């Protein structure tokens, strides 16, 4: 899973989910019980912080840190405008946290379809009408009686992808659930 916190033009994206990232990214090589935090900064570019993320020691440390954060949060006010406990200052502006439907990302889509003329055209037409740009598309070899279709999209607002996939799923030539995995390029 990848946890993402990003400032968008209309708010803050906060999300955790399975994510495909480029293999050449340093964070793609974090394995096992290790965790990493990738920070994109204007002055220095990307910086990576890497270390233990699971097991008795790291888990206990995280629990203690959470308890300390709760105890320190004595500056919380009734109107919900508390200060940041560790830094003891107030936010300069209120920036909304975006809903899942408002977030923007690319997608890996895998569809199992009947091997019929026009299926690919129907799928790409639905994506096009939703304003979804296709980055790459590949039709896999036949698997039993179905043809797997793999599509990578350019970044799109999730609500548009939800609507398009519902329309594609409703096509009578589509079998099984459509697989959707979010993509991140990590370049912004």
Locate the predicted segments by residue:
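Short, glycine-/Ser/Thr-/acidic-enriched flexible segments
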Residues: 7, 19-23, 42-45, 53-56, ...
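A conserved regulatory-domain signal marking ACT and ACT-like small-molecule sensing domains
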Residues: 62, 67-188
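Structured core elements
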Residues: 1, 15, 38, 48-50, ...
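Gly/His-enriched, cation/cofactor- and phosphate-binding structural elements
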Residues: 28-72
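Substrate-binding/catalytic subdomain of NAD(P)-dependent oxidoreductase enzymes
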Residues: 1-29, 34-36, 55
């Amino acid at each position: 899973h990848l946890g993402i916190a990003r400032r968008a033009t209309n708010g803050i994206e906060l999300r955790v989910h399975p994510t495909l990232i480029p293999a050449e990214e340093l964070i793609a090589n974090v394995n096992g019980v290790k965790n990493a935090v990738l920070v994109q900064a204007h002055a220095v570019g990307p910086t990576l912080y890497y270390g233990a993320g699971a097991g008795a020691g790291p888990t206990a440390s995280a629990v203690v840190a959470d308890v300390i954060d709760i105890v320190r949060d004595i500056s919380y006010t009734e109107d919900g405008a508390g200060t940041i406990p560790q830094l003891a200052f107030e936010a300069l502006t209120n920036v909304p946290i975006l809903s899942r439907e408002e977030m923007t990302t690319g997608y890996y889509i895998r569809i199992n379809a009947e091997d019929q003329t026009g299926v690919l055209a129907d799928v790409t037409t639905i994506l096009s009408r939703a304003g979804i740009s296709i980055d790459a598309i590949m039709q896999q070899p036949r698997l039993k009686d179905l043809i797997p279709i793999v599509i990578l999209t350019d970044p799109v607002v999730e609500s548009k992808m939800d609507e398009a996939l519902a329309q594609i799923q409703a096509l009578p030539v589509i079998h099984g659930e459509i697989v959707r995995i979010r993509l991140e390029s990590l370049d912004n």
